[in-house]
Curated annotation (Swiss-Prot):
Keywords: RNA-binding. Pfam families: BTV_NS2 (PF04514). One of its GO terms (molecular function) is RNA binding. This is Non-structural protein NS2. The gene is Segment-8. Belongs to the orbivirus non-structural protein NS2 family.
Amino acid sequence: MEQKQRRFTKNVFVLDQKRKTICGQIAARQSLPYCQIKIGRNFALRAVATPEPKGYVLEICDVGAYRIQDGNDVISLMISADGVEGTQERWEEWKFESDLMRTNGHSSKYKRSVGRREIKVSKGMGIVPPYTRNDFDRRELPELPGVQRSKYDIRELRQKIREEREKGAVEQPHKPAFKTERGMNRPDSDEDQNPAGGVVNDWTCETQKRDQEAERREALEIRLADNDRESKHSNWIVRGRGKILKEVKNSFRTQEVERKKSDMGEVIIEEDDEDSEEEEGARASYITSAYIERISRIRKIKDERLSMLASMMPQQSGEYTTTLFIKKQKWDNVPLYLIDEMQKKYELQSVGSCERVAFVSKGTNLIILPVASNPR
């Protein structure tokens, strides 16, 4: 048995200040402003002083057919001078004035307590008199251009459409994808219609399966060939990137070794004993420990003029690009250089003491040259 939808009790508080309806008359007899209409499993009328929380307040000025709409909740009321009739069900044979509810907050006394509550308010104009027949028949199909009326009602029409759809779904899997040449040129013979002649259909299905299998194998071979070609292309790209990466690493390693040699703050660090011995053997005899110690001290001072330059060891002879400044300092046991400021060249003279030190740059590298006082 189908379960009926449950209807909750709704409270409508009719405010008829002109006392033209039975609701206004009931409220006037009790000297109260509102007439409560309770609609649910039962129907009741009574006069009240204030509306209940979450109730519907309908302010009217005359008799009429009112339809209260609040979301999915619909309450239809016929309010006249001598009676009230209402329902929450469909009531389409009569015309109604639609009144949309607006939620408002208020403060009122309810059950001996005063507090803030929520009510929904709407105002009816009495445009539609009660029990006005609805001339429009929803069951009648209007005459529409390009549309022909079916001889079946809506239930029979839906059943017909459902049966045709199910019949098509059942017949479709057994329908052959193609017919033989004989079947395409002329209608099916009695032999084809005979159940004993199912050999032709079996042969047709077998041929179709073989063709589908051949197409599947061909598509698989094409996919495998494409994957193989993409794999080879990817391997070629990976090998090329690996080669470039290896060259970059070698170049970076060479620059790092040169930077370690030229960085005075880290020149004392030794990676292992063998590398240290090789570097000591390869290092020129004119680069003395006193010179290295002097340069280390200069780098630790962190002069702003030298902060953007990387330290570089001077060679026996070389070139530079810019003379930064010359400082008066007395150094002992350091390589001494002759400096040609016109051609911007320097050349090693000897190892000894100096009273001036030239700070020159070559690109982004800093070269510190103790200046020889007397030429050779």
